[in-house]
Every structure is written in structure tokens, then in C-alpha cells.
């Protein structure tokens, strides 16, 4: 160790020494790495503020390959590029030769990367292998992303992961809890090189829609989409939803165990014969049976939890088994797809029932293009009411023009043009970032095919048959159906379960919960002066409770049912006891304060 002015050197986070010239040390390590004297896994960087040299060679770092640049020129020659293409040399050979480097996040702070060879200067240290590699897998699948605003690329990449397709070819035998399957997935008309590299075209997750950009009777304002009912009836964006239910014959201490069977009348909590009509004798439902809300899928009984109360005769009563059948979730229906029997780890019998439900696009279902242009179906228009072109083409979807300008998703417009050109030519259009097919080329294809280069067409109103004054932009674009479907989200409640502790309605759709009236909702009711509505929502429909309070001391009174009297245990009074209406949550607060040794007292006044 030397003077304080020397820079500290860290290797994998441990201080190993100091050096008087950190920049020179870092450069020496880099040169040694390129010569093969230091492992290609090593990365080095110099901290700007402190001058510390950080050397990393540990596992778990995300690194990416870049071409080395010296004096404004890539070190890799065109001959070597051709040799890699032809298979004469491997990519790894270029790495070993120090002509391609893998850079981690920390070293990336110290380098200047050029995106294209034309922009290289003497200051540049590295060059991207291909401009599209600045994107990941998700963003790389978006066509023409360089024409979009960055938040839209992020949204497009995110929603691509939520799209429905064919998740696995063995979906019939996979026991996934939830699974979606799109009918007739299509290969996108406009593709990128990333799409081809990952084999997305072999198993796509979307369909090509014919889209007209125009308003439609106000049904597509605020990102709503108008869909052609005829297309939907011809199975556009139709999908199936699979949910797997599971039951197990558990074993308990003492040799008792669960049993798959039809619960008899002697079973505690049995639902009656009607509930079990579609079960076989073994307690399992048959495939292709229609099931709906709270249908029993697996008839099951369990041993009792506790010994019964003693009978008058002195002995214990015979133990009754409990009903613990597996039922459908509330609000869901469908058809039993498969019933699978298997064995658990401890040798217990395991049953899995898969239920499928056909999902036809309906009002409220979410769709999105690859450019972050998401929307929900606002209207299903009959085909005869949809606008049509001179050739008689009726669009599958009508998109509001206001969705485009402020969001600057020009890539969406270009994909529509490219999709139209590809459809007419019967070919796939390359929309790879930075290097894809140009706009002029696409426009030329449209003109060659007898269409306007702008993509606009004369359209006629389906309702009146009159020609629409403005020309309408029509094209083909790849749309995803997302798994956010209204049938999974629709929820309402009038009465239902309450929480044990607070006696307020449960929370959430899965628990058949109530809809919370929060502070802001409360304020709007106050603003209307609707006092009785306020009381009804916040008290009567929630956790109203009547308790007896002593008017003398303000303590909670006691009701003795056997003696049929209500009295205050504090004052021993019976005359001055009043029945008070309050929230059970408040009563719980009073009880918890009493448990802490605090005696809350209520001051009673006559209601006006």
C-alpha cells in the first residue's frame, strides 16, 4: 500500500492494492485480455469520481458482445465476417482473437459504442454487431420500433408477453393451473430478424387484422375498438381458457384418510343429491360434462376434526365425516376437458380436473398491437353496418385516428402499410429495426398493385351505402388478444361472506367480496347531501351492530338471556340502559382497548 493519492484497486469487490495511474492500469488489463493473456471473462472499469479500478470476473453478470474499434475502424475485417457466415471460423474464434469483446454493465460506463459503422469517430471504442441488438427479445420483435416513442416500445414489449397463442403443444396433458389457447394463430405479415431467430413464426401469438383508421359513431373514443361481428362469428380471436382443479386423498395421523366418493346423507355438510348427479361412483366427474358456478368436480369426504359431544346415554356419538368436495370457482363455467388420476409423493391418490371455457371476443376484452396501442372492445358492429372499400373489403377492426398523433406510434402506421403490401404480394415484409424494408419500397409495392401509395382508400358507409367523404387509411396489422378478459374481471355483489374479525364484507372477486366505498366516494355522497345513502353504504350494508350501553357510566352493558335482563355490570343498573347502533369495527376497537386496561366510556345524548 502506498500514498493516499493512489487509486484503490478492487477485484470482485475485495481491495487488493493501489495504483498511481488507474486509467493506464485499466487499459493494460484490456490489452492483455485482447491478447489472450487475461481471461475473456474479465471486465474492468474506472470510477469517474473516485478513480477506483473495479475488476470483475465473478459469476452472474449480464454481458453482451461488441466489436472492438481502433482508430475509428472496426478491428474485424470483411473477410472474417464472410468466414463466420460461411462457417469457416466460429464466433468464439473472433472473441479469442480479441476482435469481439463481451462487456458487462460496469465496463459499459467506460466505453463509447457506435450503433452504425458510418458514425464511427476516433473517440469510439466499440461498435454494435447489428443496430437491432440495442433491443432485447421483446422490443426486437416489434417492427419499425425506431419510428415509435420509447414508452410505447416498452408497453408493446410488455403486452406481447400477455398475448394468447399456443403455449405448449402438449397443452391437453399439462396440469397448469391457468392456460389460454388461441384458435388459428397466424404468422405476422411484417416480421423482424429477432422473430425468425427465436422461432416465433412457428408458434405465433396473434392474428393479422384488416384495420380501418376512422371514427365509428363514437363507439371507439378513448381507445375503444370497434370489431366486426361477422369476423368474430368466423372465429377471429376466439380462444379457450383452461383451469385445473386439484384434489388429494390425504392421510392423517391415526390411520384416517380422505376418500373420493359421493358424500352420503350422513356426511356433515352434504349438499343434497342434486349437487352430485354428474359424479361417478368413484366421486370423479366425467370428461365433456357441462359444469357451472359452484358445480362439484370431485366428491370428497374427510374424517372429523374433533370428537363429538357426549350423548345423553353417556358414550360418544359415532363420528361423522366432513364434506370437503372440490367445486368450481364462483362465476366460472365450462366443460370438463380431462380428468387425470395420479399418485402423490407419499403414495396418496391425486386427481386433477381440467375445465375448458370457450372465450369469444366480447365488450371489454383487451387487444393490442405490437406498438403499445392497446384498447378494449367498445362495440361489436354487424358486418352489414361496417364500412367497406371499393373492392368490398370489410375491416375486422376500426381504430380511432386520435390514438395515433399524440402517441407518435408511426411504426404502427408503417406496419399497416407493410402488412397491406405483404398481403397483396403474398410475402412477408421485413420490419427489422434500422435495417428493415424502407417506406418508399412499401409504397412502391402498393402503387404497383393498383393502390394508392398513402394506403388510403375510398370507403362506403355500411349503414347508408353512401360514399364516405374522406379517404380512409386501411391496412393489415398484427394484433394480440391479451389475457385481460372481461369475463375474468366482471364482479358484483349484493350479499355474501363477511370477515370473521371485523364482520365487514370480504375483499376481492375470488372471495365474492364487496366493492369498497372509500374516502373519495364518501365525499361525493356528502357533496350531494345524501345522508341516508351515506349511512346505508357505510353502516347498514357493511358491519352494523346494536349493543347495549349504560347511560349512567357509558360502559357496555350485558344481556343475560337466561334471566332475560339487560344490566350494567359496572353500576348494577337496569333502568338506564340504551340500545346503540354502531359499526362492529368500532365495537371491536372498544373491546381491544378494554383488553389493554383502558376503559372507554360513551357519552349518550338524545337524537334530535
Curated annotation (Swiss-Prot):
GO terms for molecular function: DNA binding; DNA-directed RNA polymerase activity; ribonucleoside binding; zinc ion binding. The keyword Hydrolase does not apply. This is DNA-directed RNA polymerase subunit Rpo2C. It is an enzyme of class 2 (transferase). The gene is rpo2C. Part of the RNA polymerase complex. Its cofactor is Zn(2+). Signal peptide: none annotated. Keywords: Cytoplasm, DNA-binding, DNA-directed RNA polymerase, Metal-binding, Nucleotidyltransferase, Transcription, Transferase, Zinc. GO terms for biological process: DNA-templated transcription. GO terms for cellular component: cytoplasm; DNA-directed RNA polymerase complex. Binds 1 Zn(2+) per subunit. DNA-dependent RNA polymerase (RNAP) catalyzes the transcription of DNA into RNA using the four ribonucleoside triphosphates as substrates. The Rpo2 subunit (Rpo2N and Rpo2C in this organism) is implicated in DNA promoter recognition and in nucleotide binding. It is found in: Cytoplasm. Its main location: cytoplasm. InterPro entries: DNA-dir_RNA_pol_su2 (IPR015712), DNA-dir_RNAP_su2_dom (IPR007120), DNA-dir_RNAP_su2_hyb_sf (IPR037033), RNA_pol_bsu_CS (IPR007121), RNA_pol_Rpb2_4 (IPR007646), RNA_pol_Rpb2_7 (IPR007641), RNA_pol_RPB2_OB-fold (IPR014724), RNAP_Rpo2 (IPR019969). It catalyses: RNA(n) + a ribonucleoside 5'-triphosphate = RNA(n+1) + diphosphate. Residues 278-326 are annotated as: Disordered. PROSITE patterns: RNA_POL_BETA (PS01166). Belongs to the RNA polymerase beta chain family. Its EC number is 2.7.7.6. It comes from Halobacterium salinarum (strain ATCC 29341 / DSM 671 / R1). It comes from the Archaea. Zn(2+) binds at residues 550, 553, 568, 571.
Amino acid at each position: 500500500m502506498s500514498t493516499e493519492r493512489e487509486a484503490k484497486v478492487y477485484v470482485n469487490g475485495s481491495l487488493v492494492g493501489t495504483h498511481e495511474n488507474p486509467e493506464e492500469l485499466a487499459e493494460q488489463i484490456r490489452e492483455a485480455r485482447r491478447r489472450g493473456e487475461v481471461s475473456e471473462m474479465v471486465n474492468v472499469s474506472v470510477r469517474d469520481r473516485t478513480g477506483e479500478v473495479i475488476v470483475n470476473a465473478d459469476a452472474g453478470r449480464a454481458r453482451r458482445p461488441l466489436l472492438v474499434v481502433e482508430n475509428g475502424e472496426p478491428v474485424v475485417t470483411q473477410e472474417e465476417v464472410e468466414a463466420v457466415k460461411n462457417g469457416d471460423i466460429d464466433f468464439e474464434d473472433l472473441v479469442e482473437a480479441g476482435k469481439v469483446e463481451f462487456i458487462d454493465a460496469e465496463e459499459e460506463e467506460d466505453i463509447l459504442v457506435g450503433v452504425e459503422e458510418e458514425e464511427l469517430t476516433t473517440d469510439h471504442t466499440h461498435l454494435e454487431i447489428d443496430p437491432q441488438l440495442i433491443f432485447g427479445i421483446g422490443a426486437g420483435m416489434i417492427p419499425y420500433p425506431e419510428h415509435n416513442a420509447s414508452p410505447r416500445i416498452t408497453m408493446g414489449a410488455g403486452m406481447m408477453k400477455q398475448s394468447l397463442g399456443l403455449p405448449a403443444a402438449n397443452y391437453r396433458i399439462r396440469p397448469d393451473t391457468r392456460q389460454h389457447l388461441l384458435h388459428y394463430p397466424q404468422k405476422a405479415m411484417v416480421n423482424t430478424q429477432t422473430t425468425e431467430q427465436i422461432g416465433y413464426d412457428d408458434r405465433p401469438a396473434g392474428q393479422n387484422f384488416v384495420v380501418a383508421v376512422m371514427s365509428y359513431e363514437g363507439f371507439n373514443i378513448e381507445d375503444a375498438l370497434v370489431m366486426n361481428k361477422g369476423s368474430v362469428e368466423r372465429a377471429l380471436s376466439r380462444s379457450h381458457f383452461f383451469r385445473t382443479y386439484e384434489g388429494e386423498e390425504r392421510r392423517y395421523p391415526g390411520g384416517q384418510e380422505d376418500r373420493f366418493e359421493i358424500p352420503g346423507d350422513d356426511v356433515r355438510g352434504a349438499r343434497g343429491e342434486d349437487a352430485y348427479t354428474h359424479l361417478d361412483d368413484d366421486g370423479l366427474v366425467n370428461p365433456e360434462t357441462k359444469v357451472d358456478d359452484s358445480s362439484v368436480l370431485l366428491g370428497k369426504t374427510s374424517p372429523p376434526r374433533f370428537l363429538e359431544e357426549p350423548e345423553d346415554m353417556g358414550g360418544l356419538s359415532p363420528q361423522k365425516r366432513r364434506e370437503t368436495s372440490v367445486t368450481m370457482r364462483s362465476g366460472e363455467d365450462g366443460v370438463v376437458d380431462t380428468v387425470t388420476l395420479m399418485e402423490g409423493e407419499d403414495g396418496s391418490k391425486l386427481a386433477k380436473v381440467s375445465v375448458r371455457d370457450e372465450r369469444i371476443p366480447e365488450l371489454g376484452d383487451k387487444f393490442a398491437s405490437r406498438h403499445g396501442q392497446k384498447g378494449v372492445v367498445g362495440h361489436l358492429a354487424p358486418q352489414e353496418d361496417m364500412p367497406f372499400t371499393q373492392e368490398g373489403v370489410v375491416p375486422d377492426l376500426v381504430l380511432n385516428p386520435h390514438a395515433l398523433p399524440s402517441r407518435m406510434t408511426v411504426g404502427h402506421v408503417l406496419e399497416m402499410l407493410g402488412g397491406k403490401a405483404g398481403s397483396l404480394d403474398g410475402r412477408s415484409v421485413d420490419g427489422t429495426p434500422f435495417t428493415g424494408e424502407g417506406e418508399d419500397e412499401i409504397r412502391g409495392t402498393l402503387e404497383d398493385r393498383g393502390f394508392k401509395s398513402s394506403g388510403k382508400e375510398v370507403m362506403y358507409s355500411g349503414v347508408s351505402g353512401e360514399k364516405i367523404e374522406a379517404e380512409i387509411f386501411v391496412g393489415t396489422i398484427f394484433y394480440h388478444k391479451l389475457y385481460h378478459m372481461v369475463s375474468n374481471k366482471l364482479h358484483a355483489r349484493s350479499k355474501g361472506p363477511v370477515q370473521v374479525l371485523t364482520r365487514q364484507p370480504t375483499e376481492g372477486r375470488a372471495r365474492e367480496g364487496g366493492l369498497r366505498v372509500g374516502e373519495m366516494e364518501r365525499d361525493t355522497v356528502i357533496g350531494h347531501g345524501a345522508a341516508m345513502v351515506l349511512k346505508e353504504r357505510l353502516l347498514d350494508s357493511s358491519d352494523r351492530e346494536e349493543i347495549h350501553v349504560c347511560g349512567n357510566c357509558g360502559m357496555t352493558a350485558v344481556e343475560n338471556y337466561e334471566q332475560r335482563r339487560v344490566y350494567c355490570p359496572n353500576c348494577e343498573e337496569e333502568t338506564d340502559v340504551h340500545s346503540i347502533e354502531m359499526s362492529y369495527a368500532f365495537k371491536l376497537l372498544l373491546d381491544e382497548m378494554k383488553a389493554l386496561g383502558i376503559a372507554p366510556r360513551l357519552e349518550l345524548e338524545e337524537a334530535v
